[in-house]
Amino acid sequence: MISLPSLRLAFATALFCSGLAVLAPRAQAAVQLPTGFQDQVLASGLDWPTGIAFLPDGRILVCELQSGRLRMIVNGELAAIDPIGIVDSLATSGGEQGLLGVVADPRWPSKPFIYTLSSALDATLRISRFTAAGDLSDGTSGNLAIVAGSRRELIRDIASVTEVHSGGTLRFGPDSLLYVSLGEDAIACTATDTTKLNGVILRLEVRGLPDTPGPPNKPLLAAAGNPWVTSANINRRLVWEVGLRNPFRFSIDKPTGRLFIADVGFDQFEEVNVTSTGGLNFGWPYLEGTTTFVTNECGIPAPPGLVGPSFKYARTEYCANNCPATIIGGVVLRSVPNSTVTFPASYDGRYLFSDYYTGFIWMLRDSSGTWVKAPVVQGQPSTADWARGYAQASDYVLGPDGAVYYALNGYDFASGSGEVRRIVHDNGNVGLAGRAASRVEFAPVYPSPSRGSASLRFVLPRAARARLAIYDALGRRVRELQPEASLTAGEHLAVWDGRDESGRNVAPGVYMARLGVDGQSFARRIPLVR
């Protein structure tokens, strides 16, 4: 999938020549969207946010790849308890290891469980469950945290010896079963060996597990209807699909139950596999796209019945010199009635995905079972690209409001430059990225953490009396940036230089920016480091 700059050049070169994805540092390009759409930031200052998921009450979970932190976004900002937990004992070398994915139990709040996929220090991947406590039913509360000692291991023996091709997504289907994508660990012949749990999609029954912490119990995870559920081999009982290389991101369309699996290719094709049927073999390593890759791997000839992709794209379609590519699976769009940010109903059933390197978003539609490019809409940056500027996006989810939410790893590998953002359609409510807002908008502090300078942006929907000041952790005012005064409608920017009223540098720590507007109060945290 992705690689951090800590990779040594020789190792990176070797990976690239073998066809694996290696990320070259680059700045984020400007976002280009069709007419009527906007891209908005929800939370900034994150360290390599890799996976996101919604709680059923609308709060957003975020997992950071190498820190192991689980963070939560509430009402457009990081929760008061931050992080809500840390997944420890992570292997983080190489750049594709760490905390890869997160999802919440759909039975929340009666079953307040959070599931993760992570790389462990013993060269394995682990699927774990944690219990949360706090305000479980209040979607506006930041009072939520992982209970210490609540970890239950579901599976902890998935091989991860090569530091790459780990997979990374967990999603619940409309059948309440947990689906998990796992890469082939850069050992191609494991992708067709259903006893290895590599290069597969798992389908797990978690409702029979005890609510308490404990070790794995694989027999309880075997879901009825799995294609090999009667096998004598316990691993085979858990497998839903096989023959995948690195299905880093997939999504499930809840109305239809179909899986949209984005599988990262070797050096020719990236592909999307659409399925609602278990037991399929998507062909790796015998096929890359629809092209024969090998006829025999590890002494095993290609089996019959291989299934080609629902959609594929060649690197040569957008780069004559066969540049790097990594498909990032997106979501199937579903409009939400009365939402001011939902995609229009004309987009219903369409599937969007992006490429981690080039940053394009493509839009697909179902044409009698064949997935093809959707018709061009007004304002697209090109006939091929529905949008541009999404390099380093690492995960997408469809929000309960019909907007598309995504995690952005970061800009040019800068620490703390990761963000969670969303793509919205302007249905009468425009936030920070567009015209004057219909309510006061106070953007997250940038950068976060701040090193001597913090930018504070806010938007007033109309002329109002406003005041902006900085306070320390004890509630003492440190600096007044904007004395109370009448300000015009529109966007305003203030910069705090990390000094107090006397011009002295303040000590490192967490400070609070408080914005008052006509009796209303808004706040943003400023982590300050030196």
Spans of features found by a protein language model:
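A short helix->beta-strand "capping" segment at the edge of beta-propeller domains
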Residues: 30-46, 147-151
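Beta-propeller domain segments
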Residues: 32, 68, 97-99, 107-109, ...
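Surface loop/turn motifs at the tips and blade-to-blade linkers of beta-strand repeat domains
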Residues: 41-47, 84-94, 155-161, 239-242, ...
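Asp-box/WD-like beta-propeller blade repeats and closely related beta-sheet repeat scaffolds
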Residues: 126-171
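Short, glycine-anchored, charge-dense loop/turn motifs used at functional sites
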Residues: 176, 402, 470-478, 511
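Residue-level detector of functionally pivotal "anchor" positions at catalytic/ligand-binding pockets or at interdomain
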Residues: 426-446, 461, 477-478, 521, ...
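C-terminal tail/sorting-segment detector
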Residues: 454, 480, 485, 495, ...
